[in-house]
């Protein structure tokens, strides 16, 4: 009996391990086969040793990539002053404002002028809070596990965005110079403030749903929403400061000499110095090879305000986007541009090139997915906005590389700029916003077609940060 007990006791771990492996799981035999097939040459052991104390990118770096040293550009839009979004996801706002400020600097021969990002960000966060709460009211009768309702509560608020936010906030609330409402700590470091507001929004969203379940009418819920927004406003003003309603500002030229001193409201300042219909003067273009080209698409909930513009874009082959961007640069007009900036980015040189790192050789495996497959599988999407402002053309007028003005401060990249090869542009460029005057009439007609609606959880719902 004792021998039987000991035998069972010794066999128990093996039986338990075997019982834990269900169909489709990794069995001990499978694991042993995988391990036995691993290469173990001297080179493999040396590589493992090297990677134990070195970054992957450092070992995969291609030292012979010519893109790392070529900083000449045949066509470039002048700019003054590099902005810095610091530890925030406001690149979309900095980029849109960089486009606007470049025009203002050129027109009035100013120095390194900046709009207040903090002022516009304040109202962006208030508008996004209202967007969430009103969407909760609109969908209050749907179950909590409805896909849209679930998406809303997963994404109540973000500091990221698109050019739509620039359109909405500047045209609705105007703009002010940076010195009128300067950056605060919580404008530069948004994560804690955003998480606190998001927590409050989820609480409020749940309360609105509970009110609807008790039979409260939409008018009652919307009245409660206004009270809730009062709390959000208080959090924002405590963290970012109270937005000015009037201010005095002295315009100075590039040499610092005063030009004029006037009283403004944010709206009058915008109308005098920007004065542009941002919602109707621009065309939003996308390169998404996972979907049919020459069609217009819009993504549900991909907007900054409830009554604002939704991200609606004309999908074009990359070969049709490039000539439009080149025409804009030749006209000294910058563009809102966004891409998947983390792919093949060499932070030491400020260069984006598909030849920067050779991961295939390092790990002895190919990475064959093309751009369309990367989009479909959520492996790549737009992640960061910058200002497209230079292109280098060869003798035949073909682009070889591009340059963007970034918002990571003057000490990052190439004096605050990033350089991308034309091949990288093909693979990881997603959005560019171009003035209509550079777009052919046939494309404008396509842009005005009724767009195909995509759900909020589509792979291309991605905010620039």
Protein language model regions, located:
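Bacterial Sec-dependent N-terminal signal peptides
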Residues: 1-22
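Stable alpha-helical elements in mature extracytoplasmic
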Residues: 87, 95-96, 100, 162-171, ...
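Papain-like cysteine protease catalytic cores
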Residues: 117-247
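Post-signal peptide N-terminal segment of secreted/secretory-pathway proteins
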Residues: 67-139
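Structural recognition of the beta-strand scaffold that forms the well-ordered cores
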Residues: 93, 119-122, 168, 177-180, ...
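Active-site signature of cysteine proteases
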Residues: 22, 215-465
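Second-shell loop/turn segments in exported
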Residues: 77-89, 151-157, 308-315, 324-325, ...
């Amino acid at each position: 009996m004792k021998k039987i007990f000991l035998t069972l006791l010794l066999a128990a771990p093996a039986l338990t391990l075997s019982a834990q492996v269900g169909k489709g799981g990794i069995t001990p035999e499978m694991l042993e086969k995988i391990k036995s097939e691993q290469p173990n040459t001297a080179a493999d052991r040396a590589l493992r040793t090297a990677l134990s104390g070195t970054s992957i990118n450092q070992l995969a770096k291609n030292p012979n990539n010519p893109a790392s040293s070529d900083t000449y550009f045949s066509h470039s839009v002048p700019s003054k002053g590099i902005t810095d979004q610091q530890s925030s996801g406001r690149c979309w706002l900095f980029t849109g404002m960089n486009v606007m400020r470049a025009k203002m600097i050129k027109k009035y021969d100013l120095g390194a002028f900046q709009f207040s990002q903090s002022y516009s960000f304040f109202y962006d966060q208030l508008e996004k809070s209202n967007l969430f709460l009103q969407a909760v009211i609109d969908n209050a009768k749907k179950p909590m596990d409805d896909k849209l309702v679930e998406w809303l509560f997963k994404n109540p608020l973000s500091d990221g965005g698109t050019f739509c936010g620039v359109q909405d906030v500047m045209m609705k609330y105007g703009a002010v110079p940076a010195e009128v409402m300067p950056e605060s700590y919580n404008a530069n470091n948004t994560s804690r403030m955003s998480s606190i507001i998001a927590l409050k929004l989820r609480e409020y969203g749940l309360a609105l749903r509970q009110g609807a379940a008790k039979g409260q009418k939409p008018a009652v819920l919307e009245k409660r929403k206004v009270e809730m927004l009062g709390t959000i406003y208080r959090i924002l003003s405590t963290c970012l400061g109270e937005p000015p309603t009037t201010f005095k500002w002295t315009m100075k030229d590039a040499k610092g000499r005063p030009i004029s001193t006037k009283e403004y409201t944010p709206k009058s300042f915008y109308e005098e110095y920007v004065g542009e219909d941002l919602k109707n003067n621009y065309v939003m273009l996308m390169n998404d090879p996972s979907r049919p080209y020459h069609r217009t698409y819009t993504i549900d909930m991909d907007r900054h305000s409830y009554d604002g513009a939704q991200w609606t874009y004309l999908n074009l082959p990359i070969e049709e986007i490039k000539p439009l961007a080149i025409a804009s640069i030749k006209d000294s007009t910058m563009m809102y541009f966004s891409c998947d900036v983390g792919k093949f980015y060499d932070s030491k040189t400020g260069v984006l090139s598909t030849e920067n790192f050779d991961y295939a050789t390092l790990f002895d495996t190919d990475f064959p997915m093309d751009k369309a497959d990367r989009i479909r599988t959520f492996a790549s999407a737009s992640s960061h906005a910058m200002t497209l402002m230079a292109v280098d053309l060869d003798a035949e007028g073909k682009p070889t590389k591009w340059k963007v003005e970034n918002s990571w401060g003057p000490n990052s990249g190439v004096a605050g700029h990033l350089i991308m090869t034309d091949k990288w542009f093909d693979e990881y460029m997603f959005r560019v916003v171009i003035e209509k005057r550079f777009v052919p009439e046939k494309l404008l007609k396509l842009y005005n077609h009724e767009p195909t609606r995509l759900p909020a959880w589509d792979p291309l719902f991605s905010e620039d940060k």
